[in-house]
From Swiss-Prot:
Subunit details: Interacts with LIPH.
Membrane topology: Single-pass type I membrane protein
Protein name from the UniProt record: TPA-induced transmembrane protein
Region (Disordered), start-end ranges: 1-37
Protein's gene: TTMP
Function (record text): Has a role in LIPH-mediated synthesis of 2-acyl lysophosphatidic acid (LPA). LPA is a bioactive lipid mediator involved in different biological processes, and necessary to promote hair formation and growth.
Known disease link: Hypotrichosis 15: A form of hypotrichosis, a condition characterized by the presence of less than the normal amount of hair and abnormal hair follicles and shafts, which are thin and atrophic. The extent of scalp and body hair involvement can be very variable, within as well as between families. HYPT15 is an autosomal recessive form characterized by sparse to absent scalp and body hair. Eyebrows and eyelashes may be sparse or absent as well.
Superkingdom to which the source organism belongs: Eukaryota
Length: 217
């Protein structure tokens, strides 16, 4: 029997590292192309553009920037306007209010009030009415400048009426003034409106009925 011959040793494969040849680094079109690294940030295109507000941050005088100067001017104008309005309101003079009138004549009105039955026994009522009439006409925007005095002329418990004498100072020989400012409708209307706005304590129904007041010269 033939003995098996030993197998030939297998040749070991040698692995060699392939190195890039210099000519392989050259691109086909002949132009070198540089690829940015991942760690490098590509600046945005807008970064090269100047902001339209950048001029406001420029120093004009020392450390004062342009926006500071504009804001100061704006606030200064507003302050001047406010001060001017305040001074105008304080120094305003109403020519009509301060006009000195020559009230050389007197105008007399008699006003009679009918007292409700529940108020006849009120002893202080005539005094309260005197104070009320004085306050009404002395503080009236229309007649306050001309009002002089008010006095009780007659008080009748039986007829439940009280009559007052109203005195006003008026310019002489002024028909328009007497027609519009000292008309009976105006003098009586002021008192009626006051009774509607505020009643007499203890006699709430007094003056609410227009027929309970009579004005005559």
């Amino acid at each position: 029997m033939d003995l098996a011959q030993p197998s030939q040793p297998v040749d070991e494969l040698e692995l060699s590292v392939l190195e890039r040849q210099p000519e392989e680094n050259t691109p086909l079109n002949g132009a070198d192309k540089v690829f940015p690294s991942l760690d490098e940030e590509v600046p945005p295109a807008e970064a090269n553009k100047e902001s339209p507000w950048s001029s406001c941050n420029k120093n004009v005088v020392g450390r004062c920037k342009l926006w500071m100067i504009i804001t100061s001017i704006f606030l200064g104008v507003i302050t001047v306007i406010i001060i001017g309005l305040c001074l105008a309101a304080v120094t305003y003079v109403d020519e009509d209010e301060n006009e000195i009138l020559e009230l050389s004549s007197n105008k007399t009105f008699f006003i009679m009030l009918k007292i409700p039955e529940e108020c006849v026994a009120e002893e202080e009522l005539p005094h309260l009415l005197t104070e009320r009439l004085t306050d009404v006409y002395s503080t009236s925007p229309s007649l306050g400048r001309y009002f002089t005095s008010v006095e009780i002329v007659d008080f009748s418990g039986e007829n439940a009426t009280v009559t007052y004498d109203l005195q006003f100072g008026v310019p002489s020989d002024d028909e328009n003034f007497m027609k519009y400012m000292m008309s009976e409708e105006l003098v009586l209307g002021i008192l009626l409106q006051d009774f509607r706005d505020q009643n007499i304590p203890g006699c709430e129904s007094l003056g609410l009925d227009p027929t309970s007041l009579l004005l005559y010269e």
